[in-house]
């Protein structure tokens, strides 16, 4: 019996020893094991992006469009008068010479004069969730030379020479733990030619507004809870990625509204056809 116990103990000791490389079973100095463990963990490439409290960055999203992060973001609005830091009046846009008229008036940014993301005085005739990015795809001679090459959706959205493929495009804006969706309706801030940032990997160019690279409407500002000037992330999104929300309810230019109207027309037409066939 005693021999069996000794033999079993020897087998167990041999199995434990096999788990360590040669010499690993010798005594370590105090703290040496924990030091080696820390070094082995910190040498792992998947943990090198950990933040100070040890949380590993999440894997990148699999999306057609990447996030542009930490972009200085300013608030602008339809009908805005020119100022020192905004020399271009916003009663017109890069693609609409009567923007304020088509919108229905000035999109007053004062929170005290707004309700439910709308200016209190009227219901906008266009989507109050809008943005500006520093690129315009058209010029007096048609599309800019680089437009067909750098705009990812150019071919699928092309409707003829000189007709913008950027106006109305949806983007997502992220601030802290909230994400808002809005339509691209103007070019700016300051520039209309920076395709290397809008569609590429460059950062926004320096300007009078702390290097701002995105303008957002008062509705976007209010939904996100951001300041008039703040820092956000943004990216383009295809329409089928946009969930319904307050950005889906209003505006003749709003993809949701347009689609809902078309569905309603088809339903009415089908009902009329059914009635006539009886």
Where in the sequence are the language-model features?
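Bacterial N-terminal signal peptides that target proteins for export
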Residues: 2-10
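Bacterial N-terminal signal peptides
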Residues: 9-18
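Bacterial Sec-dependent signal peptides at the C-terminal "C-region" and cleavage site
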Residues: 17-27
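Secreted/periplasmic proteins
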Residues: 27-278
């Amino acid at each position: 019996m005693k021999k069996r116990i000794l033999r079993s103990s020897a087998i167990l000791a041999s199995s434990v020893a096999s788990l360590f490389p040669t010499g690993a079973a010798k005594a370590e100095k105090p703290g040496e094991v924990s030091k080696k463990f820390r070094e082995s963990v910190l040498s792992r490439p998947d943990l090198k992006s950990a933040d100070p409290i040890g949380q590993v960055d999440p894997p990148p999203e699999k999306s057609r469009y990447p996030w542009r992060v930490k972009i200085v973001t300013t608030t602008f609005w339809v009908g805005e008068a020119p100022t020192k830091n905004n020399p271009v009046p916003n009663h017109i846009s890069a693609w609409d010479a009567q923007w304020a008229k088509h919108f229905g008036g000035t999109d007053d940014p004062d929170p005290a004069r707004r309700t439910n993301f709308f200016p209190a005085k009227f219901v906008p005739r266009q989507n109050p969730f809008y943005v500006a990015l520093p690129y315009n795809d058209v010029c007096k001679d048609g599309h800019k030379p680089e437009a067909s090459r750098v705009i990812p959706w150019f071919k699928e959205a092309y409707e003829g020479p000189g007709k913008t493929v950027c106006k109305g495009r949806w983007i997502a804006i992220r601030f802290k733990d909230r994400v808002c969706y809005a339509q691209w309706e103007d070019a700016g801030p300051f520039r209309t030619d920076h395709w290397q940032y809008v569609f590429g990997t460059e950062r926004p160019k320096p300007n009078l507004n702390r290097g701002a690279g995105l303008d957002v409407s008062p509705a976007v500002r209010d939904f996100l809870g951001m300041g008039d000037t703040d820092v956000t992330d943004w990216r383009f999104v295809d329409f089928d990625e946009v969930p319904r929300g307050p950005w889906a309810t209003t505006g003749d230019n709003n993809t949701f509204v347009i689609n809902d109207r078309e569905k309603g027309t088809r339903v009415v037409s089908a009902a009329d056809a059914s009635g006539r066939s009886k």
